[in-house]
Amino acid sequence: MMPEYHQSVMFNESMYALNIKTDGIYIDATFGRGGHAQGILNRLSKKGRLIAFDQDINAIEYANKNLVDNRLTLIHSAFSKMLSIITKQGLIGRIDGILIDLGVSSPQLENAQRGFSFRVDGPLDMRMNQTTGMSATQWLKSANEEEIANVIYQFSNEKKSRHIANKIKKYQKNHVLETTLELANIVSKVVKKQKNKHPATRTFQAIRIFINQELKQLISVLEQSKDILSKNGRLSIISFHSIEDRIVKRFIQKNSRQKTLPKGLPIIENEIEKTYLKDLGKYLTSKAEIDNNKRARSAILRVASKN
């Protein structure tokens, strides 16, 4: 049993949505600090199995120290590589449920060295996997003003994106932009403070999404899930902003909607294009959870099952 640390968002709803079979095989695509993983394991029998992914080596190390369970397999990898990994394990079409929590974990936000937070000072990194790729500092240095503005707008809908990008480049003429509070202060001079929202929220979100290619990875794993899941297997995704949720919503709608066929055509059953999924709806965060955990206020859980 793990020490209580990370507060898993929409825990009860996600456990219900997975419709867990005691002897089933499940995937937690984003282990984090293991709150959801522990919940799944608690509902499995000795024959059940959980495969947990995380690209953050700190999460894997935490799991190895705090969650020793022979039903659990830990994979240090981005979930976008799920299909190839599950294929190698001989489990294609045998997974009874996939849970994807797209949020940044509390330890990641609270660890200044990770560079995710605009509230504590630290190196401007923002990589989920710090062993690979370009940090936020490196990208902001190499990108031009237009590229920065486009990323900030595309991944957060920040209306002041061009003004922010201009201020970033002006700052870099005389300074090395390398800490979180430096960036937060630049943005705060451009964006007005809103109730319950820091001025730099959208900018940090956009740069983090870009650095980690989060939307590209999400689109990839959603498509992969159609092959990975067993018949009636559940797909449950918790998103935290409208851009993510729109991708999930459209994917489920596209794959659960039967195409309209012209009347009178001589088509036999096996020629009709089948739908992959059944849309099981969405869940919103309860007021009680929001009161207890402000970070949960924007969470949406969407659920589908494989036909």
Swiss-Prot record:
GO terms for biological process: rRNA base methylation. It is found in: Cytoplasm. Its EC number is 2.1.1.199. InterPro entries: RsmH (IPR002903), SAM-dep_MeTrfase_MraW_recog (IPR023397), SAM-dependent_MTases_sf (IPR029063). It catalyses: cytidine(1402) in 16S rRNA + S-adenosyl-L-methionine = N(4)-methylcytidine(1402) in 16S rRNA + S-adenosyl-L-homocysteine + H(+). One of its GO terms (cellular component) is cytoplasm. Specifically methylates the N4 position of cytidine in position 1402 (C1402) of 16S rRNA. This is Ribosomal RNA small subunit methyltransferase H.
